[in-house]
UniProtKB/Swiss-Prot annotation:
It comes from Anaeromyxobacter sp. (strain K). It holds the Pfam family ATP-synt_ab. It is found in: Cell inner membrane. It catalyses: ATP + H2O + 4 H(+)(in) = ADP + phosphate + 5 H(+)(out). This is ATP synthase subunit alpha. Its EC number is 7.1.2.2. InterPro entries: ATP_synth_asu-like_sf, ATP_synth_asu_C, ATP_synth_asu_C_sf, ATP_synth_F1_a_nt-bd_dom, ATP_synth_F1_asu, ATPase_a/bsu_AS, ATPase_F1/V1/A1_a/bsu_N, ATPase_F1/V1/A1_a/bsu_N_sf. The record marks 362 as: Required for activity. GO terms for cellular component: plasma membrane; proton-transporting ATP synthase complex. One of its GO terms (molecular function) is ATP binding. ATP binds at residues 169-176. Keywords: ATP synthesis, ATP-binding, Cell inner membrane, Cell membrane, CF(1), Hydrogen ion transport, Ion transport, Membrane, Nucleotide-binding, Translocase, Transport.
Length: 510
C-alpha cells in the first residue's frame, strides 16, 4: 500500500482543526492546617469573605477570615479525609440556596440539600444566603394579627405579622411546643412556615416532622435541620438558609413565619468557629460580633409596605436559658433585638400551668396594634387581674385570715390561671378564645362572674364543654365574631343568653 504524504497531512490538519481543549483556570491554594472543620489555606490571595471554596472530595468550604498570608475557612461537610497540603480551589461563588414552592413539605439540611429521601428539589429559583434586610422606607408598622392559637399569648402578648417575638425559657419548659402549635393553628391561613432546627438530636427533629405530618401541617411547612452531629459551620449557616427561603414568600407579597429552634446553639457553634479561627474572645468567650450574628438575621423579618407587595415575615426565635437567668449574654442580646419576649418558667410548668408563660415578664412591644378588637374588649383587664392575683398569692401564704375581698380576688385569679391552660397540639381559633375569655372575665346579670360558681379544678372542663355546646347549639356566635372581629351589642346579648342556657346544663362533678 502506497503512503501518500499529502493525504496524511490533510488528515492531520483536519484533526488539529477539530481539536479544542478547554483549559480550566482556577486559583488554587494548599491547606496549612485543618482542625475541627476549620482550615487555614495558603495561596488564595484573591479569595473574598463569604466565598465558597472546593476541598478534596467535592466538599465545600466558606471563607470567614482574610489574613495577610492565609485565609481561614469553615468546611461544610465531612472533613476527616482532608489533610495538610491538600489542594483547595476558589469557586468565585457566594453561598446560595434553592427557594420557592418546591421546598414546601420538604426537610433540608443547612445548605438546602434535601435529606428526607424524596429525591431532588427541582427548585426554579436560588438566592444568596447573606443579603441586606429591608430598609425603613420599605417597611410598614405591624398591624395584622398572627394568631398562635394559644389563649395566654393571643390575649396577653399578641403577635403581629412581621414581628420578632422571642420565646425563652429553661430546657423542657415547652418552648418548641408553643412554636409547633403556632404552625398548626395557621392551617388554611395562607401562612408559609419554616422550622429551623439547630443542634438538635435527629430523633427530636423526626418527631417534630411526624407531628406536622399527622396534623396536615407539612403541606405549608419546610424543615431546615442542622443536627447536633452536623459540623459547626452547618449549625451556624442553617438560620440564614431558613430566612432566605422564607424571604422568597415575603418578597412575593405573601406571609411567612420562621422559627429558629434555637439560637443559643447557633451562638455556641459560631463561638466554636471563631475560637478555632483565633478571633479574640469576649464575654463568656463569645466573639465581639455575636450581637451582629443575631441582629442581621432577625432584622430580615419585616412587614413590607404596600408599594413592596405588603408581604410579611414573622420570626419566633427561641433561646434556652440556664436556671431561668435572662440576664446572661445571649438572652439579653436577643431580647434587645426583638419586639418582645414570651418567658416560659419551669416552676409554672411543674405546677401544671401549660403553656408555662410568666405573664409578668412576658411582653409584646408592637403586637397590641395587631390584636383584633374583640380580644381587646374581653382581655383588657386580664393582665392586670393576673398580676394582682400573683402579688396577693405571694402574701396570702404568710397570713391565715384574709378579708372577703382578698379571698374573692384569689378565687378569681385561680380561675383565670385555669382559663389560660391549654393542651399541646390543641390550638383554638381566635373567635373561640374570645368566647372562653368572655366567660371567664365578664359578669352576668347578677353582677357575678360567669365561672364564679365553677370549682377551680373544673374550669378547664367547663371551657371545653362550653365550646362543644356553642358549636352544636349556637354556631352563629363564633361565626359572627370571626366576621366582625368585634363584640357588638347583638353578639353580647346572644352570648349572654347562650352562657345562661349552658349554666343550666353544665353539671358540677363531685
Amino acid at each position: 500500500m502506497e503512503i501518500r504524504a499529502d493525504e496524511i497531512s490533510r488528515i492531520i490538519r483536519e484533526q488539529i482543526k477539530d481539536y479544542g481543549k478547554k483549559v480550566e483556570v482556577a486559583e488554587t491554594g494548599s491547606i496549612l492546617s485543618q482542625a475541627d472543620g476549620v482550615a487555614r489555606i495558603y495561596g488564595l490571595a484573591g479569595a473574598a469573605a463569604g466565598e465558597l471554596l472546593e476541598f478534596p472530595g467535592g466538599v465545600r468550604g466558606l471563607v470567614l477570615n482574610l489574613e495577610e498570608d492565609n485565609v481561614g475557612a469553615a468546611i461544610m461537610g465531612p472533613y476527616e479525609h482532608i489533610r495538610e497540603g491538600d489542594p483547595v480551589k476558589r469557586t468565585g461563588l457566594i453561598a446560595e440556596v434553592p427557594v420557592g414552592e418546591e421546598l414546601l413539605g420538604r426537610v433540608v439540611d443547612g445548605l438546602g440539600n434535601p435529606i428526607d429521601g424524596r429525591g431532588p428539589l427541582n427548585a426554579k429559583h436560588h438566592r444568596k444566603i447573606e443579603i441586606k434586610a429591608p430598609g425603613i422606607v420599605k417597611r410598614k408598622s405591624v398591624h395584622e394579627p398572627m394568631q398562635t392559637g394559644l389563649k395566654a399569648i393571643d390575649a396577653l402578648v399578641p403577635i403581629g405579622r412581621g414581628q420578632r417575638e422571642l420565646i425563652l425559657g429553661d430546657r423542657q419548659t415547652g418552648k418548641t411546643a408553643v412554636a409547633i402549635d403556632t404552625i398548626l393553628n395557621n392551617k388554611g391561613n395562607n401562612l408559609y412556615c419554616f422550622y429551623v432546627a439547630i443542634g438538635q438530636k435527629q430523633s427530636t427533629v423526626a418527631r417534630v416532622v411526624d407531628t406536622l405530618k399527622k396534623y396536615g401541617a407539612m403541606e405549608y411547612t419546610t424543615v431546615i435541620s442542622a443536627s447536633a452531629s452536623d459540623p459547626a459551620p452547618m449549625q451556624y449557616l442553617a438560620p440564614y438558609t431558613g430566612v432566605t427561603m422564607a424571604e422568597y414568600f415575603r418578597d412575593s407579597g405573601r406571609h411567612a413565619l420562621i422559627i429558629y429552634d434555637d439560637l443559643s446553639k447557633q451562638a455556641v457553634a459560631y463561638r466554636q468557629l471563631s475560637l478555632l479561627l483565633r478571633r479574640p474572645p469576649g464575654r463568656e468567650a463569645y466573639p465581639g460580633d455575636v450581637f451582629y450574628l443575631h441582629s442581621r438575621l432577625l432584622e430580615r423579618a419585616a412587614k413590607l409596605s404596600d408599594k413592596e407587595g405588603a408581604g410579611s415575615l414573622t420570626a419566633l426565635p427561641i433561646i434556652e436559658t440556664q436556671a431561668g437567668d435572662v440576664s446572661a449574654y445571649i438572652p439579653t442580646n436577643v431580647i434587645s433585638i426583638t419586639d418582645g419576649q414570651i418567658f416560659l418558667e419551669s416552676n409554672l410548668f411543674y405546677q401544671g400551668v401549660r403553656p408555662a408563660i410568666n405573664v409578668g415578664i412576658s411582653v409584646s412591644r408592637v403586637g397590641g396594634s395587631a390584636q383584633i378588637k374583640a380580644m381587646k374588649q374581653v382581655a383588657g383587664s386580664l393582665k392586670l387581674d393576673l398580676a394582682q392575683y400573683r402579688e396577693l398569692a405571694a402574701f396570702a401564704q404568710f397570713g391565715s385570715d384574709l378579708d372577703k375581698a382578698t379571698q374573692e380576688t384569689l378565687a378569681r385569679g385561680e380561675r383565670l390561671v385555669e382559663l389560660l391552660k391549654q393542651g399541646q397540639y390543641a390550638p383554638l381559633p381566635v373567635e373561640k378564645q374570645v368566647i372562653q375569655i368572655y366567660a371567664g372575665t365578664q359578669k352576668d346579670t347578677d353582677g357575678q362572674n360567669w365561672i364564679r360558681a365553677v370549682p377551680t379544678e373544673q374550669v378547664v372542663r367547663y371551657m371545653r364543654e362550653l365550646i362543644e355546646f356553642l358549636d352544636a347549639r349556637h354556631p352563629g356566635i363564633a361565626k359572627a365574631i370571626a366576621e366582625k372581629k368585634a363584640l357588638d351589642d347583638g353578639i353580647r346579648k346572644d352570648l349572654d343568653a347562650a352562657l345562661r342556657e349552658f349554666a343550666g346544663i353544665f353539671k358540677i362533678e363531685g
